From Swiss-Prot:
EC category: ligase
NCBIfam families: gltX_bact
Annotated protein name in UniProt: Glutamate--tRNA ligase 2
Family that this chain belongs to: Belongs to the class-I aminoacyl-tRNA synthetase family. Glutamate--tRNA ligase type 1 subfamily.
InterPro entries according to UniProt: aa-tRNA-synth_I_cd-bd, aa-tRNA-synth_I_codon-bd_sub2, aa-tRNA-synth_I_CS, aa_tRNA-synth_I_cd-bd_sf, Glu-tRNA-ligase_bac/mito, Glu/Gln-tRNA-synth, Glu/Gln-tRNA-synth_Ib_cat-dom, GluQ/Sye
Subunit structure: Monomer.
Organism listed in the record: Brucella suis biovar 1 (strain 1330)
EC assignment: 6.1.1.17
Gene expressing this chain: gltX2
């Protein structure tokens, strides 16, 4: 019987959860779910100078917001240092690693010699077979792995295929420093083995590490997990992803008003696809996702595509769910604090009532919040440039007779208001747009908004008439 699939996401807490890391987490999560397995979380916090608790919290928060739940407690790599030392010492005892007493001066000499000979710098193995009794007094050694010198190390990769590394290029690298702390290369292998990880899905920049890690697995006689190294994300112009392309933290995407489900949908298609399907539910992603279908080539990040997908998700969202998502993100978006303060019971009811019209015109929650500002605007309304041009003398003249028409409407519903304005337009020989445009400007201070009859209903009779009255004098 085959082992249950266990994947892991192993970020370093030196900053936010960036978009590449979020995609890696998503792929690990989906594959674990697809196989009925588990995704574990390990915080690779061995770099004590750069690792921070705030960064760890930001990563956990980002994963939670994205809906990527992990199994069990998050594991701290730093706290496992005694186990890493134990395995390094075991490798020495078994003749698979050795103590190296080479001084910094000797190592620099090796580097200089390699440079002079046009070779990449490599440790020359001078302590590989020496008797430790020859060790200089008072020098704390490092532990180096005894890497094979002949042949090649092959990484069997589900995405990249078999990748071969000549062993002459892989020197006896350090697994334990002289202060007793493990190197990243060593700690990762010990942790993945002890956690029972069966499948490693990570960025292609780790492919060279995979060769060295395979050497440690083989030295310990452990099974090597199935590796999948995914190509990095590039910008739309094909260059390496940078902040201008979208290499931001997940928290930034949240503050820009993207929905987690939409971001998941966009990220899953960066390097993986299922036929021509663009929009897919989480259940479909889980059913369809397989590492063998991940593309070798680099994916390109496209903000416009993300916006389009987010807009689709917003339009298909339940009004209450979208309202809740907006309220949750208000503290983080520009102008959101003022909007949040205006949300008393009446304001909440108005915003929910406006949601069907607002979501049709917004691609992000930020745009949704901006579109909703008219509800809470103070009188007299500040007019934007286009609204002011619509409320010129001609616009006000068109609007003046509309006031008594609206005042006389019995039932304040979109249908009744529509019928009354259309009848007035017909009687005056005007097209509906000729009335709707200055009316919208008077009600919202803008030239664009949800449907003008929906706006009248959301504002209510009293506020609507008052705003029109402000403009016609």
């Amino acid at each position: 019987m085959s082992k249950p699939v266990i994947t892991r996401f192993a970020p370093s807490p030196t900053g936010y959860l960036h978009i590449g890391g979020a995609r890696t987490a998503l792929f690990n999560w989906l594959y674990a779910k697809h196989c009925g397995g588990k995704m574990l979380l390990r915080i690779e916090d061995t770099d004590r100078e750069r690792s921070t608790e705030a960064a760890t919290a930001a990563i956990l928060d980002g994963l939670t917001w994205l809906g990527l739940d992990w199994d069990g407690e998050a594991i701290s790599q730093f706290e496992r240092a005694p186990r890493h030392r134990e395995v390094a010492e075991e490798l020495v005892a078994n003749g698979k690693a050795y103590y190296c007493y080479a001084s910094p001066e000797e190592l620099e000499e090796m580097r200089e010699k390699a440079r002079a000979e046009g070779r990449p710098p490599r440790y020359d193995g001078r302590w590989r077979d020496r008797d430790p009794s020859e060790a200089p007094a008072g020098v704390k050694p490092v532990i180096r792995i005894k890497a094979p010198r002949d042949g090649e190390t092959v990484v069997h990769d589900a995405v990249q295929g078999d990748v071969r590394f000549p062993n002459k290029d892989l020197d006896d690298f350090i697994i334990l420093r002289s202060d007793g702390t493990p190197t990243y290369m060593h700690a990762v292998v010990v942790d993945d083995h002890d956690m029972g990880v069966t499948h490693i899905i990570r960025g292609g920049d780790h492919l060279t590490n995979a060769a060295r890690q395979t050497i440690i697995y083989n030295a310990m006689g452990w099974d090597v997990p199935q590796m999948s190294h995914i190509s990095l994300i590039h910008g739309a112009d094909g260059a390496k992803l940078s902040k201008r392309h979208g290499a931001l933290g997940v928290d930034a995407y949240r503050a820009m008003g993207y929905l987690p489900a939409a971001l998941r949908n966009y990220l899953v298609r960066l390097g993986w696809s299922h036929g021509d399907d663009e929009i897919m539910s989480t259940e479909q992603m889980i059913e369809w996702f397989d590492v063998k279908d991940i593309n070798k080539g680099a994916a390109r990040f496209d903000f416009q595509k993300l916006e389009a997908i987010n807009g689709l998700y917003m339009r298909s969202s339940d009004d209450q769910a979208l309202f809740d998502a907006l309220v949750a993100v208000l503290p983080e978006i520009e102008g959101g604090k003022e909007l949040a303060e205006a949300l008393d019971d009446k304001g909440r009811a108005q915003l929910l009532l406006a949601m069907p019209g607002l979501k049709e015109r917004a691609k992000t929650l930020v745009e949704l919040a901006d579109g909703a500002k008219f509800i809470f605007a103070s009188r007299p309304l500040a007019l934007d440039e286009k609204a002011a041009s619509l409320l010129n003398d001609e616009g006000r003249a068109v609007l003046k007779p509309v006031y008594p028409v609206l005042e006389a409407v019995g039932e304040w519903t979109a249908e009744s208001l529509d019928a009354a304005i259309r009848a007035h337009a017909e009687a005056e020989g005007l097209k509906l747009g000729k009335i709707a445009q200055p009316l919208r400007a008077a009600l919202t201070g803008r030239a664009t908004s949800p449907g003008v009859f929906d706006v009248l209903v959301v504002l209510g009779r009293e506020e609507s008439l008052a705003r029109i009255g402000d403009q016609i004098g």
